[in-house]
Amino acid sequence: MSKITNNVFLTIRNAINISDVIQNYIKVIKKGNNYWAICPFHNDTNESLSINDKKQIFKCFACNHAGDVIKFVAEYKKISYALAAQEIVQLMNLDLNLLNHLQKISPQEIKKNKVFDLNKQIQKWFINFLNNKNNIHVIDYLTKRNLNKNDLAYFKIGYAPNNDELLNLIKSNYNNLIQENDEFELNKLIENSFLVIDKNGNYHDFFNDRIIFSIYDHLNNVVGFSGRIITNEKTPKYLNTKTTAVFKKDEVLYNFHNVITIENNHQLFIVEGFMDVITIHKSNKPNVVATMGVELTNKHLELIKSYGIKDLILCFDNDQAGFLATKKQIMKLINSPFNIFIVNHKDNDCKDMDEYANKHGYSATSKLLDQQLHISEFLLLEISNTNKSTPSLKHSYKQECFTIIKKYGDIFYVDKYVDFMKQTFSIEENLLKKVIEELLINKQCNSIQNKKNIQSYQKQTQLTNKLTTSNPKVILTKIDKHFNHLVVIILMNRVFLNRLDTQVRNRLTKEQSLVINIIEDFYLYHFKINNILKNTDSFIEFINKNYSKYTNVINQLTKMVQIIKYNPKFDNIVAFELAKNNFIYEWLNNQIKRLKLINLNLNMNNNQEQIINNEKLIKQYNDEKILLDNLINASLFHKNQ
């Protein structure tokens, strides 16, 4: 799709609720958080079609038909995507300027839709070839690979026989096909990797004696195919559709069209190949995609991010090539908004997840997939075999460990860092823990505070006495004050939601999870808003409309945002609304960190006199920290007037 088309379609998708559009064509019923309807794309008798406003997609759990609002209208009315988009604009009274853009879409967009139709038809033939009784040997092969009928149907797996059977089928149907779709013109079949032409001008099948994997885009269009050899080891193991207008490997992730239909999913397993996807899916982890032999690209990451995925779990092959691929991918992802984890293969003798499942079973595979390393743990393990035979080398190794923790670490893994380092260094555990905590707290402060906030520290602390002399009243009575800090930060900027990885969310109470979900839903619904505190009216209207049954939490959240918005003191101190266990003011922590690092080295050299002097300074800074704590707490409590 062209850039202009992508932008217009995305604008339409974000401007409406998919259920509001679909109910103009079929009857929908709300059940829970989703809407349901009788699927119009197959002979449905039950309400099998799920419509999810949060993800802006529909999916039939009977026929697996799925896609976004534009795809629904296009296929329901049997019109092009461009015409479907125009109809939605008019139906929902959207900005008429969108019509002008849509009408400028080139005829090439229409041709792409015809390619989708072409791919869909030939996909059916590949599947029919697989189910042909003459090809029972292929079913036997797949059965030995632990693929059953449900797997074949779910992943739309087919077979391309030998002897140009696809070419013969095309010839026998050519007259009818060419009337329905001019993409069956022979040069189009070559362009889309169904036929090849030899040096004598004769046509042949592109795929021969290969298992066929269907590749979809995120809109559930069949965009290409990949064929795996069965017997002929002299040819490439995989043969893929060549790059076309609709198939670009740097934009497509295998199985992503299925992943985005999973409810409340924030994690994504990333593997290299098709069989690994199927294996992990069968191990009760359906949220898995394959990169199909390429690195994750910026286009991949933009696509993943647009569907609310927050945790990326790398699970590449367990060999030297896979290890290098993991390292390379980590370096690309290190500054991304995602939380990065790596499946810990340990020292098993299996190259990939498919081999592991064949040897140990799917239950054991599921447990292995749960053994994930945070990116910082992975990097620490990588350097663990460093030469430490001399004091100098050991010191360099220690500094490298601290550098990794400071640069890539996370406050939630402090205990793991301590356990790792105490095995090598003779450092008192509590002291080591404090030093690591300071490194990470300071790092997190750097990520959210600007120089102006730091320079205004003295001015802000002058407000402490006035603010803390009030009679404080907790805003969220059942949510502890540390969580209050986190809530305010998330209200200030949506990017901090990305810090809440799955492990953090699992620690929240039921009421805390509700608060986070409410804020998250608002940001998802209002995709252009990044700061709730600047849009309090919209937020209050949203929560009262959608969460009215949670009266207590709604009232308390309403009170919180109103206090922050209308209390002028918050204009000066809102930057200090930091989670106590995650964030603290940078200036003080810089000093404490510096002193403790000095003491760490002094402790190793038994310089007790200087240690005592530094401890006095640390106490002084900690006293100032207490005042800062009062300031933070006061900013989260209601000051009685």
Curated annotation (Swiss-Prot):
Gene3D superfamilies: 3.40.1360.10, DNA primase, catalytic core, N-terminal domain (3.90.980.10), Zinc finger, CHC2-type domain (3.90.580.10). One of its GO terms (cellular component) is primosome complex. Residues 266-348 form the Toprim domain. Pfam families: DNAG_N, Toprim_2, Zn_ribbon_DnaG. A zinc finger (CHC2-type) spans 39-63. Mg(2+) 1 binds at E272, D317. Keywords: DNA replication, DNA-binding, DNA-directed RNA polymerase, Magnesium, Metal-binding, Nucleotidyltransferase, Primosome, Transcription, Transferase, Zinc, Zinc-finger. Its cofactor is Zn(2+); Mg(2+). Binds 1 zinc ion per monomer. The keyword Ubl conjugation does not apply. CDD domains: TOPRIM_DnaG_primases. Belongs to the DnaG primase family. This is DNA primase. The gene is dnaG.
